[in-house]
Design a protein with these regions (language model features):
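N-terminal leader/linker segments that initiate helical-solenoid repeat arrays
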Residues: 12, 17-132, 136-139, 144-152, ...
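Flexible helix-coil transition and linker loops at the boundaries of alpha-helical arrays
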Residues: 32-33, 69-79, 108-123, 160-170, ...
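Start-of-helix register in tetratricopeptide repeats
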Residues: 44, 81, 125, 171, ...
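Structural register within alpha-helical repeat arrays
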Residues: 46-49, 86, 130, 137, ...
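Structural motif corresponding to the intra-repeat A-B loop/turn of tetratricopeptide repeats
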Residues: 55, 93, 137, 141, ...
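Alpha-helical adaptor scaffolds
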Residues: 334-348, 355-361, 365-404
């Protein structure tokens, strides 16, 4: 889940300068005949001296403002003016949370008057930065109830800003979209889909306003669409993005992944033809990316093999996997050799599967599991003499996923070859594993009876 993308600190540091100029111009406005009273005007030099000190004496500046606030009417221009100066102090200190209260109060005082204390430009700037302050506090707190409250305030402030702003801009729309998304995801276990839809609407407005839209617009829209499970729209957007920016590897990866997601959804609903279609689209996306020089990692190459295998294109899967293992384009891992063998088995080429497993044992000479896979392949071909050698090699090497299976397999194979002593020993070993107790015990009893009968017959003769 993305976090707020904007840098509040840089913007808010600039606000102090903006407000200093804005407040100074208030008294000069032709429509507004407001100015500080004498008591405020006479005390301001002390405030300025504290702020101009190197470093600024913030405690002294705040003390001067607090003293003045106690002396002026609560609804006066002086109060609004002093609140503006106070929020400047907090902003310069980096105390952004503390700047919220004087900003809110000064706006309330201004808008209660006609004409307002602050002109339209300053009012818009104050609301816009108030949005960002709320947003920052919401994003930083771990208290979800408090976060929800700040997000709601930020949303309302942004709605008001849009109402009083003649023309919005792309950056503002991005902030609003991020705000709505973050608000919608306060409860990640139960996201607010209506807020996510609103976030998409604001992204779309921003995209129309931007000459060269930031990637953040697209990232945010994709996250919202995916959260809403509107995967077809995500795929459509990503198709546009890879054409617009074919050198962006992240877009190629997301495109291939979204097609797989859609395929999985159709698979769940048993719409197998559609599932196959979107698996193929994922394959094509990966191959397009590789043509552009992306998605060539061993993991990407393995994923491509996996998709081919899942849609029963075993010949292509085997071709890519064999070549990948040979050229190190796919990780040299025992499981991958097993998958290669399985691909050949699906193609009714068991001997090639066995050869693949034997190649795997050359790469992993200590892997008992690969030896056991070879043994099973020979068993399926009704070649117990070959099978038993590899079962015994598998047990000797160890590293088996399910050792009891190897012992039971040895017991049955040895029995078929009338090597009863070997079979009995293997059956007894199988009982040492919880999963092998039942079959191992039954096999042991049968073999013991057989050997006993054989011994009795021998003695009688």
């Amino acid at each position: 889940m993305p976090t707020p993308f904007i840098s509040f600190t840089r913007r808010l540091l600039g606000l102090a300068v903006t407000l200093t100029v804005g407040v100074a111009l208030l008294a000069q406005s032709a429509q507004r005949d407001y100015s500080p009273t004498d008591i405020t005007a006479e005390t301001l030099p002390k405030y300025k001296e504290a702020m101009d000190a190197k470093p600024p004496n913030y405690p002294s500046a705040l003390a001067i403002l607090n003293t003045l606030q106690a002396k002026v009417p609560a609804d006066s221009y002086d109060m609004a003016y002093l609140l503006q100066l106070k929020l400047q102090v907090y902003l310069q200190q980096g105390e952004y949370a503390k700047a919220i209260e004087p900003m809110e109060r000064s706006l309330t005082l201004s808008e209660a008057k006609n004409p307002t204390f602050f002109d339209e430009r300053v009012t818009r700037e104050l609301y816009f930065f108030l949005v960002q302050l709320y947003f920052q506090e919401a994003a930083q707190t771990k208290n979800t109830t408090l976060a929800a409250s700040y997000f709601e305030k930020a949303d309302k402030a942004m709605v008001h800003w849009l109402k009083i702003t003649p023309q919005t801009n792309a950056d503002a729309q991005l902030i609003y979209a991020q705000l709505l998304f973050s608000r919608g995801m306060v409860n990640t276990a139960n996201p607010d889909n209506d807020l996510l839809k609103r976030a998409i609407e604001q992204v779309d407005i921003g995209l129309k306003l931007a000459t060269r839209p930031k990637d953040t617009f697209y990232v945010l829209k994709l996250v919202c669409l995916n959260q809403l499970e509107r995967y077809a729209e995500s795929a459509e957007l990503l198709e546009s993005l890879v054409k617009l920016k074919p050198d962006n590897t992240a877009y190629w990866q997301q495109l291939a992944a979204i097609y797989l997601t859609i395929a999985a959804k159709y698979d769940e609903t048993k719409e197998l033809q559609l599932a196959r279609e979107f698996n193929i689209r994922s394959i094509i996306s990966i191959e397009r990316a590789q043509t552009n020089g992306f998605m060539n990692s061993p993991k990407d190459n393995y994923n491509l093999v996996g998709i081919y295998f899942n849609i029963a294109q075993y010949e292509k899967a085997a071709e890519l996997l064999a070549n990948g293992l040979k050229t190190a384009k796919i990780e040299n891992d025992p499981k991958n050799w097993e998958l290669l063998a399985l691909s050949y088995q699906q193609l009714q080429q068991p001997l090639k599967g066995i050869e693949a497993l034997k190649d795997g044992t050359k790469a992993f000479p200590k892997s008992g599991q690969l030896e056991f896979q070879i043994a099973q392949a020979y068993t399926s071909l009704d070649k117990p003499e070959e099978a038993i050698k590899h079962i015994q090699a598998a047990i000797a090497k160890g590293d088996l996923t399910k050792p009891y299976q190897a012992y039971l397999s040895l017991a049955y194979t040895a029995y078929s070859l009338q090597k009863y002593e070997i079979a009995l020993e293997a059956a007894r070993k199988a009982t040492e594993f919880p999963e092998g107790v039942k079959d191992g015990t039954n096999m042991s009893k049968a073999l013991e009876d057989l050997l006993r009968d054989r011994e009795n017959k021998k003695n009688r003769t």
